[in-house]
Structures are given as structure tokens and as C-alpha cells.
Amino acid sequence: MKNLPVLFLVLALMVCSSVIMTPSAQSGSMPKDGELVFPTDYKSFPVFLSGVQKPDAVRDLYLNPIGAKTQHGQTFPNGSILVMEIYHAKKDAAGNFEKGADGLLVKADLAKVFVMQKDAGWGANAPDNLKNSDWIFSAFKPNGDRLEVDYHACRSCHLPLGDAKDYVHRYDEYFEKRGHAH
């Protein structure tokens, strides 16, 4: 009976890890791009940034509690998960993008969800010229089904950010908004 709380904790950790990792990751092999499991609870994560404007889309980003402990100037720890929702921008009857009173694009329907997850050694399977530390990328349809994308394009876009930004776009903006910038 004394070990019941410990047993419960071990079981809870096993269940939580199985939700995030793919079967290949659970069996000890390193996951590859496109093999992450859709994190169904990501809306409960702290907001990384919201309302990020693109020419024809609006993005909302979430960072799991492990990653949210990171301080400015640090790399995100193993176990970090960054989720990006990409929304279509709303159009009027004439096909023009609608803007709110603030002059920003208005969100329409959710188009897709991209996930970056980091863990020890996970970047080993990435091509040498496209290594983004130990981040792995996956893309999903709004319903959580896998979306086939060119992950080399994801890696190429994040590569110029380098180790200083841990290959994460808007790294400095996040910490400035969070109030932890130096």
C-alpha cells in the first residue's frame, strides 16, 4: 500500500508519454518528420503567440508547459512541443481579405496544424544539411489526421534561425511578450 502513490505516478507517466510519442518512438527508435502523434490537448498549453499575420493567413501558436519554462537565451528542453494553428484569412463576397477594426486580418476556418517536438537524439535522422537540433516536424488536418507535406521545406525555413533561437521563429518576440527578455 505504501508504494501505491508511486505506482500511480509511474502509470500516469506511461500513459502521458504514449499519447505524445508514436509507436516507433515508444519502441526506442527515433521518430522522423511526419511521425509525431497529434497532441489533442494542445489548446490547454500556454499561448506562445496569437494572431500572427501572414499575407493570407492568421496563425496561433501554443507551447507545452515543459517548453514554457524556458527563459530567454536558453534552448527549449527535451519534451518541448510547439503547435501552430494556421487559419485561412476571412474573405468578403468580392474575394478581398477582411480586416478587423485593428487593421488585422480576420480568422476564418482552421486550415492545418503543424507540430514541432523536441527530444534527445530525435534530430539524428534529419539530413545533415537540414538539422534543426533535435526538433521533429509533423503536419495535420484540422481533424487530427496526418497531412502530407514537404518536411524539407519546414526544416529549410527554420534552419537560418540556428542554435541561438533554437530554430524557433519569433523566439525573441515570444520572450518580449512574456516579459522575460533581457
Where are these regions (language model features)?
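Sec/Tat signal peptide C-region and signal peptidase I cleavage site
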Residues: 20-26
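Short, structured beta-strand/loop micro-motifs enriched in basic residues and often containing a Trp
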Residues: 55-67
